[in-house]
């Protein structure tokens, strides 16, 4: 585990302990099971693939440890609607406060504004957080293999299955991929960001994609900024992408989302430019 992940793990475990005092697990468990049923996260991605479209998990990220504030006018419902209008399959909502200025309330607000399924994007260590995610509207949770051992990953997986939630398991290298493939989860995400340097390289997805079995859905995360990037990865069999920062920096998020998925349309000339 890198130094930054160690520091994150320390404060997350403190947060979990404090949350358990505020709301005992039995209460949280009831709240999670009483929430309206999960929207199918994997199904939404498969629906895009079924009509030969790229599937985008569009992320709401207000800030990050490496880039600081990314979007000042951060309005989760408005952003969710813009992403849906632009053609996203699913939403990813940062709920970590100290590092990303996220909040659990963003999750429920985004989900209520659209029909799209939502991922709770956070650092999960304890099944309590999975129930917390479902109680706040999440349809899918993230398991970062760099953060947890195999026993913890298994506990998180079982909690998600208990709640009929989907799981995105995230890897950064081949060793983590080998561990991830032992879990019962359809979505395998390759994070192109080096957690030591914070630099991104799409070559990581290109290299690992061929090692992901065809019964899993490969997801490329981080460093994707254009339709050309998507096409480059599609050539390696990857048609699902998680994109946040490059879209969060755009004034017109809906238009930017559409451009990412289908490319910019060429300007009209001659009679077509005037509707003739």
Swiss-Prot record:
It catalyses: 1-(2-carboxyphenylamino)-1-deoxy-D-ribulose 5-phosphate + H(+) = (1S,2R)-1-C-(indol-3-yl)glycerol 3-phosphate + CO2 + H2O. Its EC number is 4.1.1.48. It comes from Methylocella silvestris (strain DSM 15510 / CIP 108128 / LMG 27833 / NCIMB 13906 / BL2). The keyword Nuclease does not apply. Gene3D superfamilies: Aldolase class I. GO terms for molecular function: indole-3-glycerol-phosphate synthase activity; phosphoribosylanthranilate isomerase activity. InterPro entries: Aldolase_TIM, Indole-3-glycerol_P_synth, Indole-3-glycerol_P_synth_dom, Indole-3-GlycerolPSynthase_CS, RibuloseP-bd_barrel. This is Indole-3-glycerol phosphate synthase.
